[in-house]
Amino acid sequence: MAMTPQLAFSRMPPGFRFQPTDEQLVVDYLQRRTAAQPCVTPDITDIDVYNVDPWQLPAMAMYGSDHDRYFFTMAAREAQARRTTPSGFWKPTGTKKTIFVVAGGHEVPTAVKRRFVFYLGHHQPSGSSNNNKTSWIMHEYRLMNSPRAAVPSSSSVNRLPTDDLTEEMVLCRISNKDLPKPPFIHNGLLQFSSVGLNGDGYNYLILDHLEPPAMEYPNVDIGNVDDAAAADDDPGDLDEEIDDSMQRNHGG
């Protein structure tokens, strides 16, 4: 029987908050998950993150802080990776960060962390797109020497295929810096008619149609998605610095 988010949280002690550092995510979760070893917490949800719109994800997560949710997913190897969802796509911003893990008294480069911003609309050739940036952020963690991911017998909500050597297991941290006001209902950007339930009982939105978005970032030319994403490089790096600083202050 699949564990629901409500059941998962009910098994945690009072005051429990899931706020792992980058190193903990890599060592205690991603490495152990790819080796089919039990993680510290019972489950981080397995789900096809790149086939689901980000606003559907929070209700599917087992663990997370007030603004972060964590998922395991299978992703194409970096050179072939496409991160397109039904309503938009994830665009990389900033620079990749190497995560070092202490082993044998030495810091060993073990994983790569990359930041993405979600854009509404479909990816088009440069100069011909009509996309709009949202406040949904994803940090993707990949092992530098990733083995083929094994599926433990107690795998969580959704089992993912693992026999394709062109794919690898990654860990994703999804957040929305504008919560609790989701961007998909801001200014009537998306219209929806009802709330439904998927097979596991999680809420999701049934979207009727996507209206042309209002411009929320007047200083960015969203007619060119590559330029718009490039304009995020410096803010993305700043977000990484703030994130790293907070982890150090909490002992990460």
UniProtKB/Swiss-Prot annotation:
Q: Does the keyword Cytoplasm apply?
A: yes
User: How would you summarize where this protein is expressed among tissues?
Assistant: Expressed in stems and panicles. Expressed in developing seeds.
InterPro entries recorded: NAC-dom, NAC_dom_sf
Kindly state which keywords UniProt assigns to this record, in alphabetical order: Cytoplasm, DNA-binding, Nucleus, Transcription, Transcription regulation
Ranges for region Disordered: 225-252
What single Pfam family name could you report for this chain, choosing any that match?
A: NAM
Q: What SUPFAM superfamilies does the database record attribute to this sequence? A: NAC domain
The cellular location(s) given in this protein's UniProt record come to: Nucleus; Cytoplasm
One GO term in the molecular function aspect is: sequence-specific DNA binding
Q: Which residues form the NAC domain?
A: 12-177
An example Gene Ontology cellular component term from the record? cytoplasm
Q: What is its main location?
A: nucleus
Q: Which residues bind DNA?
A: 110-183
- Quote the biased-composition stretches of kind Acidic residues, using this chain's numbering: 229-244
**Which PANTHER family does the UniProt entry name for this protein?**
NAC TRANSCRIPTION FACTOR 56, PROTEIN ATAF2
Q: How does it assemble?
A: Forms heterodimers with NAC26.
Query: What does the entry's domain section say?
Result: The NAC domain includes a DNA binding domain and a dimerization domain.
Q: What does this protein do?
A: Transcription factor involved in the regulation of seed size. Possesses transactivation activity in yeast.
> What protein does this entry describe?
NAC domain-containing protein 23
